[in-house]
Protein backbone atom coordinates (compact mmCIF):
# COMPACT_ATOMS: atom_id res chain seq x y z
CA UNK A 1 0.00 0.00 0.00
CA UNK A 2 1.11 3.53 -0.68
CA UNK A 3 1.86 5.94 2.11
CA UNK A 4 -0.75 8.77 2.12
CA UNK A 5 1.68 11.63 1.46
CA UNK A 6 3.39 9.73 -1.35
CA UNK A 7 0.07 8.85 -2.94
CA UNK A 8 -1.15 12.44 -2.74
CA UNK A 9 1.92 13.73 -4.57
CA UNK A 10 1.60 11.21 -7.38
CA UNK A 11 -2.12 11.81 -7.84
CA UNK A 12 -1.47 15.53 -8.07
CA UNK A 13 1.26 15.01 -10.66
CA UNK A 14 -0.94 12.82 -12.86
CA UNK A 15 -4.37 14.43 -12.56
CA UNK A 16 -5.62 17.98 -12.28
CA UNK A 17 -8.74 20.05 -11.92
CA UNK A 18 -12.08 18.26 -11.81
CA UNK A 19 -10.54 14.82 -12.38
CA UNK A 20 -8.22 15.28 -9.41
CA UNK A 21 -11.15 16.29 -7.23
CA UNK A 22 -13.30 13.35 -8.36
CA UNK A 23 -10.54 10.83 -7.95
CA UNK A 24 -9.54 12.07 -4.52
CA UNK A 25 -13.10 12.16 -3.20
CA UNK A 26 -14.31 8.96 -4.81
CA UNK A 27 -11.30 6.71 -4.41
CA UNK A 28 -9.14 7.99 -1.60
CA UNK A 29 -11.32 8.36 1.47
CA UNK A 30 -8.59 6.54 3.37
CA UNK A 31 -5.82 7.20 0.82
CA UNK A 32 -5.13 3.51 0.45
CA UNK A 33 -5.48 2.65 -3.23
CA UNK A 34 -2.70 2.31 -5.79
CA UNK A 35 -2.29 4.66 -8.73
CA UNK A 36 -2.99 1.84 -11.19
CA UNK A 37 -6.29 1.01 -9.52
CA UNK A 38 -7.26 4.66 -9.51
CA UNK A 39 -6.62 4.92 -13.23
CA UNK A 40 -8.61 1.75 -13.93
CA UNK A 41 -11.59 2.87 -11.88
CA UNK A 42 -12.02 6.52 -12.71
CA UNK A 43 -15.54 7.50 -11.61
CA UNK A 44 -18.20 6.99 -14.27
CA UNK A 45 -20.50 9.66 -12.92
CA UNK A 46 -20.32 13.31 -11.87
CA UNK A 47 -19.09 12.45 -8.40
CA UNK A 48 -19.40 15.90 -6.86
CA UNK A 49 -23.08 16.08 -7.76
CA UNK A 50 -23.97 12.51 -6.86
CA UNK A 51 -22.15 11.73 -3.63
CA UNK A 52 -25.42 11.12 -1.75
CA UNK A 53 -27.54 9.40 -4.39
CA UNK A 54 -27.38 6.14 -2.49
CA UNK A 55 -29.89 7.71 -0.08
CA UNK A 56 -32.63 6.86 -2.58
CA UNK A 57 -31.99 3.21 -1.70
CA UNK A 58 -31.66 3.70 2.07
CA UNK A 59 -34.40 1.22 2.97
CA UNK A 60 -33.34 -1.38 0.42
CA UNK A 61 -29.68 -1.19 1.44
CA UNK A 62 -30.75 -1.86 5.02
CA UNK A 63 -31.93 -5.31 3.93
CA UNK A 64 -28.23 -6.22 3.61
CA UNK A 65 -26.96 -7.76 6.84
CA UNK A 66 -23.24 -7.10 6.36
CA UNK A 67 -22.16 -3.58 7.27
CA UNK A 68 -19.20 -3.87 4.88
CA UNK A 69 -21.48 -4.80 1.99
CA UNK A 70 -23.83 -1.94 2.82
CA UNK A 71 -20.87 0.43 2.65
CA UNK A 72 -19.78 -1.07 -0.66
CA UNK A 73 -23.22 -0.64 -2.22
CA UNK A 74 -23.48 2.97 -1.03
CA UNK A 75 -20.03 3.67 -2.44
CA UNK A 76 -20.97 2.05 -5.74
CA UNK A 77 -24.15 4.10 -6.14
CA UNK A 78 -22.43 7.33 -5.09
CA UNK A 79 -19.24 7.02 -7.09
CA UNK A 80 -19.46 4.42 -9.85
CA UNK A 81 -23.00 4.25 -11.26
CA UNK A 82 -23.31 6.40 -14.44
CA UNK A 83 -25.41 9.55 -14.34
CA UNK A 84 -28.04 8.32 -16.79
CA UNK A 85 -29.06 5.54 -14.37
CA UNK A 86 -30.86 8.08 -12.18
CA UNK A 87 -33.03 9.60 -14.91
CA UNK A 88 -34.00 6.96 -17.51
CA UNK A 89 -36.93 4.57 -17.53
CA UNK A 90 -36.43 0.86 -17.04
CA UNK A 91 -37.59 -0.03 -20.57
CA UNK A 92 -36.57 1.87 -23.68
CA UNK A 93 -39.59 0.58 -25.62
CA UNK A 94 -42.12 0.90 -22.80
CA UNK A 95 -43.56 -2.52 -23.68
CA UNK A 96 -42.12 -4.83 -21.07
CA UNK A 97 -42.22 -2.98 -17.76
CA UNK A 98 -45.04 -1.71 -15.52
CA UNK A 99 -46.10 1.93 -15.51
CA UNK A 100 -44.16 2.59 -12.31
CA UNK A 101 -40.91 1.79 -14.16
CA UNK A 102 -41.59 4.16 -17.06
CA UNK A 103 -40.49 7.75 -17.43
CA UNK A 104 -37.89 9.70 -15.52
CA UNK A 105 -36.53 7.74 -12.57
CA UNK A 106 -38.15 4.54 -13.79
CA UNK A 107 -34.97 2.48 -13.60
CA UNK A 108 -34.48 3.55 -9.99
CA UNK A 109 -38.04 2.52 -9.12
CA UNK A 110 -37.58 -0.79 -10.95
CA UNK A 111 -34.40 -1.47 -8.97
CA UNK A 112 -36.21 -0.80 -5.72
CA UNK A 113 -38.97 -3.21 -6.75
CA UNK A 114 -36.43 -5.93 -7.57
CA UNK A 115 -34.89 -5.52 -4.11
CA UNK A 116 -38.31 -5.78 -2.48
CA UNK A 117 -39.26 -8.91 -4.41
CA UNK A 118 -35.91 -10.47 -3.55
CA UNK A 119 -36.57 -9.87 0.13
CA UNK A 120 -40.05 -11.35 -0.19
CA UNK A 121 -38.65 -14.47 -1.88
CA UNK A 122 -36.00 -14.86 0.82
CA UNK A 123 -38.78 -15.20 3.41
CA UNK A 124 -39.89 -18.45 1.77
CA UNK A 125 -38.77 -21.75 3.25
CA UNK A 126 -37.06 -23.01 0.08
CA UNK A 127 -34.38 -20.36 0.48
CA UNK A 128 -33.85 -20.94 4.21
CA UNK A 129 -30.76 -23.06 3.58
CA UNK A 130 -28.85 -20.11 2.13
CA UNK A 131 -26.27 -18.64 4.48
CA UNK A 132 -26.60 -15.00 5.51
CA UNK A 133 -23.58 -14.23 3.32
CA UNK A 134 -25.17 -15.76 0.21
CA UNK A 135 -28.46 -13.98 0.91
CA UNK A 136 -26.52 -10.73 1.03
CA UNK A 137 -24.91 -11.51 -2.32
CA UNK A 138 -28.40 -11.88 -3.78
CA UNK A 139 -29.47 -8.55 -2.27
CA UNK A 140 -26.42 -6.76 -3.63
CA UNK A 141 -26.88 -8.33 -7.06
CA UNK A 142 -30.49 -7.14 -7.18
CA UNK A 143 -29.49 -3.59 -6.34
CA UNK A 144 -26.64 -3.44 -8.86
CA UNK A 145 -27.95 -5.63 -11.70
CA UNK A 146 -28.97 -2.77 -14.03
CA UNK A 147 -26.30 -0.22 -13.12
CA UNK A 148 -24.67 -0.55 -16.56
CA UNK A 149 -27.86 -1.01 -18.57
CA UNK A 150 -26.56 1.15 -21.41
CA UNK A 151 -22.85 1.18 -20.66
CA UNK A 152 -20.49 2.46 -18.00
CA UNK A 153 -20.30 6.07 -19.11
CA UNK A 154 -22.51 7.74 -21.70
CA UNK A 155 -25.88 6.27 -22.64
CA UNK A 156 -25.32 3.73 -25.46
CA UNK A 157 -28.26 1.53 -26.51
CA UNK A 158 -26.00 -0.82 -28.44
CA UNK A 159 -24.51 -2.05 -25.15
CA UNK A 160 -27.86 -3.20 -23.74
CA UNK A 161 -27.63 -6.87 -24.85
CA UNK A 162 -24.51 -7.37 -22.72
CA UNK A 163 -25.33 -5.02 -19.86
CA UNK A 164 -25.37 -7.82 -17.29
CA UNK A 165 -21.82 -8.86 -18.14
CA UNK A 166 -20.65 -5.24 -18.25
CA UNK A 167 -22.15 -4.51 -14.83
CA UNK A 168 -20.71 -7.72 -13.36
CA UNK A 169 -17.23 -6.82 -14.59
CA UNK A 170 -17.42 -3.30 -13.17
CA UNK A 171 -18.73 -4.55 -9.82
CA UNK A 172 -15.91 -7.09 -9.67
CA UNK A 173 -13.20 -4.53 -10.44
CA UNK A 174 -14.62 -2.11 -7.89
CA UNK A 175 -14.89 -4.87 -5.28
CA UNK A 176 -11.20 -5.79 -5.68
CA UNK A 177 -10.18 -2.19 -5.04
CA UNK A 178 -12.68 -1.54 -2.26
CA UNK A 179 -12.04 -4.74 -0.30
CA UNK A 180 -8.55 -5.56 -1.62
CA UNK A 181 -9.71 -9.13 -2.16
CA UNK A 182 -11.13 -11.34 -4.90
CA UNK A 183 -14.73 -10.72 -5.85
CA UNK A 184 -17.19 -13.53 -5.00
CA UNK A 185 -18.10 -15.50 -8.12
CA UNK A 186 -21.70 -15.95 -6.94
CA UNK A 187 -22.22 -12.20 -6.79
CA UNK A 188 -20.91 -11.38 -10.25
CA UNK A 189 -22.55 -14.41 -11.84
CA UNK A 190 -25.94 -13.44 -10.40
CA UNK A 191 -25.59 -9.97 -11.94
CA UNK A 192 -24.37 -11.39 -15.24
CA UNK A 193 -27.23 -13.89 -15.52
CA UNK A 194 -30.12 -11.76 -14.27
CA UNK A 195 -31.85 -11.65 -17.69
CA UNK A 196 -32.42 -15.40 -17.58
CA UNK A 197 -33.34 -16.93 -20.93
CA UNK A 198 -32.75 -13.55 -22.60
CA UNK A 199 -29.10 -13.44 -21.54
CA UNK A 200 -27.03 -13.07 -24.72
CA UNK A 201 -24.41 -15.66 -23.80
CA UNK A 202 -26.06 -19.00 -23.04
CA UNK A 203 -23.15 -19.88 -20.75
CA UNK A 204 -24.17 -16.98 -18.50
CA UNK A 205 -27.78 -18.00 -17.95
CA UNK A 206 -28.97 -18.67 -14.37
CA UNK A 207 -27.48 -21.79 -12.84
CA UNK A 208 -26.87 -21.36 -9.11
CA UNK A 209 -29.69 -20.83 -6.58
CA UNK A 210 -28.67 -17.18 -6.22
CA UNK A 211 -28.72 -16.74 -10.00
CA UNK A 212 -32.27 -18.05 -10.13
CA UNK A 213 -33.38 -15.97 -7.15
CA UNK A 214 -32.08 -12.72 -8.64
CA UNK A 215 -33.53 -13.51 -12.07
CA UNK A 216 -36.91 -14.35 -10.53
CA UNK A 217 -37.02 -11.07 -8.58
CA UNK A 218 -36.09 -9.08 -11.68
CA UNK A 219 -38.55 -10.96 -13.88
CA UNK A 220 -41.52 -10.44 -11.56
CA UNK A 221 -40.68 -6.76 -11.03
CA UNK A 222 -40.61 -6.31 -14.81
CA UNK A 223 -44.13 -7.63 -15.49
CA UNK A 224 -46.42 -5.00 -16.98
CA UNK A 225 -49.28 -5.76 -14.57
CA UNK A 226 -47.18 -5.06 -11.44
CA UNK A 227 -47.99 -1.84 -9.59
CA UNK A 228 -46.49 -0.92 -6.22
CA UNK A 229 -47.86 2.42 -4.95
CA UNK A 230 -44.96 3.02 -2.58
CA UNK A 231 -42.46 2.80 -5.43
CA UNK A 232 -44.65 4.92 -7.72
CA UNK A 233 -43.72 7.95 -5.61
CA UNK A 234 -41.24 10.39 -7.12
CA UNK A 235 -37.91 9.10 -5.83
CA UNK A 236 -36.60 12.65 -5.71
CA UNK A 237 -39.04 13.38 -2.90
CA UNK A 238 -36.94 11.97 -0.06
CA UNK A 239 -39.44 12.97 2.63
CA UNK A 240 -42.22 11.10 0.86
CA UNK A 241 -40.09 8.00 0.43
CA UNK A 242 -39.13 8.07 4.10
CA UNK A 243 -42.81 8.16 4.98
CA UNK A 244 -43.99 5.27 2.79
CA UNK A 245 -41.02 2.93 2.32
CA UNK A 246 -41.06 1.45 5.85
CA UNK A 247 -44.56 0.13 5.11
CA UNK A 248 -43.17 -2.77 3.09
CA UNK A 249 -45.80 -5.01 1.47
CA UNK A 250 -44.63 -8.17 3.24
CA UNK A 251 -44.52 -6.82 6.80
CA UNK A 252 -46.85 -8.56 9.19
CA UNK A 253 -48.96 -6.72 11.72
Say what each PLM segment does:
Residues 154-162:
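Post-HEXXH active-site segment of zinc metalloproteases
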Residues 6, 12-15, 21, 27:
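Aromatic (phenylalanine/tyrosine) cluster motif
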Residues 129, 138, 178-236:
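Histidine/acidic-rich helix-loop-helix segments that form or flank divalent-metal centers
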Residues 45-155:
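Acidic/His-rich, divalent-metal-binding segments that scaffold phosphate/diphosphate chemistry
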Residues 114-117, 161-178:
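An active-site-proximal "capping" alpha-helix that borders the catalytic cofactor pocket
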Residues 21-22, 26, 33-34, 40:
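Short, positively charged and aromatic/hydrophobic N-terminal segments
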Amino acid sequence: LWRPAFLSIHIFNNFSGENLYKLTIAFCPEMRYTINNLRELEPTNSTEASMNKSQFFDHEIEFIQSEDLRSFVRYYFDCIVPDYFWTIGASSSGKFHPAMSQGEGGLVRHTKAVAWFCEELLRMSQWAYLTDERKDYARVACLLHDTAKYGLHEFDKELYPKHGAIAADQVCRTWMVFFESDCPYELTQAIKSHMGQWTTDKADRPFTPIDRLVHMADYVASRAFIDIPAINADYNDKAELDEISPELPWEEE
